[in-house]
């Protein structure tokens, strides 16, 4: 078998007159009565091959047996196409290959999905036949971008003198965060490893070990409820450094991301990225990961609401809640009563009891609650919301968390429906100064907003014992177009501070020692100040490639129910395997 001389998508007019050896898949076959045309595809693109009896009867006879997705080896001569046959939509559209020889390297059954960017297959079928789905050019291009992103990051971190170090996959189960995936030990009866949710503790121990600058393209595992942008196993760019301030870490990440955007996407983004405190993000956007590509910020009307004539507003403020609104500029005529009812049902998903609304017309406010506002109140309301004729005003009155969640989600929905979002923009944003802890009423305890190893502001350390809810974290999230790309922080590196953190989280001394004794002891041997960040590679590629589903950026992903339709994992195992592990199943019957 002769060696391939050209990739299909790389045959250009410069090769006219040359004999080429091509190998690839049949994208399409057209029989034009005496002539057969085949579009031959490989990962670089498509080239048209012509089978002509005047060139080779033998090749034509073979071509008559060929069908879509057959794998071929074609030998032929490159010629220019006639003027009327030029296809400028293809990189190879000015030439074609006149086949002199062809051999079938492998035949193919009729595929269950169309091998094209615009396939009509359902996602389940695509996942079951993932090896066919991956043949689609859009999928290859996504993974080429993933490779380019990873390569650029590695090269950048190498120039910054970071070492790539692998940390364990079999590790210790810890109680914080999502559920662990557990792996039973055959050697240690009744004991289990856990797959890492992140390399957090190990990268900190590498700082204790004096490595100073570490990174890893790390596989992580979390047994959690899945969404469109979550997977049970995922990849993060994990970075940690000693002796750097928060500003130095953020500056380095900005330089890295601007290089990624330029090298992998061909887009120039400016640095430094804007910074916004967590409290401001929640107040203005109702989200800790705001999409800043469009306006429509939330406006706090609580002071106005406390003295207005609408009881729903006043009672919300009196009970410690708040009233906020968004002004959908020029949207009054675009939303009927039925449309607004749909928006009301939408905010109820986020805990809101309802959605109040007003339309601004030339002669004043119109809508079901307009009667509750006199002329003076209406004027104040319009001035506060900068409302003019044609605007749609939408209000939620409730607990602060409900107001933020519901209006934040409504803002994003309206941004899409009203086409306010410039999809060509890439808006990076740092969200800083997070709360250190969050209180869970159901569990009646505090949880770490990021993780238990986040350093509080120095002046807030004592608050861990007196007012934990007021303690601020030296933490930062990187947001891109409303998606959290990753999060990081400066880390606790002193034993006494870490013990105070564990105590605030409800750990007894014994529990802290049992779970994290190795870390606490490490902090007694000269641990340097350190910090870092972890960036979600899958999500970054999803955004840069213009995909809407994280599964499109992972070669062999799981479904929303954490199963693999291709291999049918998870699956039962043999009784002998369980006996070897001294395990017995106690499967609950479905009711």
From Swiss-Prot:
The record marks 84 as: Important for tRNA non-discrimination. The keyword Ribonucleoprotein does not apply. It catalyses: tRNA(Asx) + L-aspartate + ATP = L-aspartyl-tRNA(Asx) + AMP + diphosphate. Residues 200-203 are annotated as: Aspartate. ATP binds at residues 222-224, 231, 484, 536-539. Keywords: Aminoacyl-tRNA synthetase, ATP-binding, Cytoplasm, Ligase, Nucleotide-binding, Protein biosynthesis. L-aspartate binds at residues 176, 222, 450, 491. PROSITE patterns: AA_TRNA_LIGASE_II (PS50862). One of its GO terms (molecular function) is catalytic activity, acting on a protein. Aspartyl-tRNA synthetase with relaxed tRNA specificity since it is able to aspartylate not only its cognate tRNA(Asp) but also tRNA(Asn). Reaction proceeds in two steps: L-aspartate is first activated by ATP to form Asp-AMP and then transferred to the acceptor end of tRNA(Asp/Asn). HAMAP family: Asp_tRNA_synth_type1. Homodimer. Belongs to the class-II aminoacyl-tRNA synthetase family. Type 1 subfamily. This is Aspartate--tRNA(Asp/Asn) ligase. It comes from Bacillus anthracis.
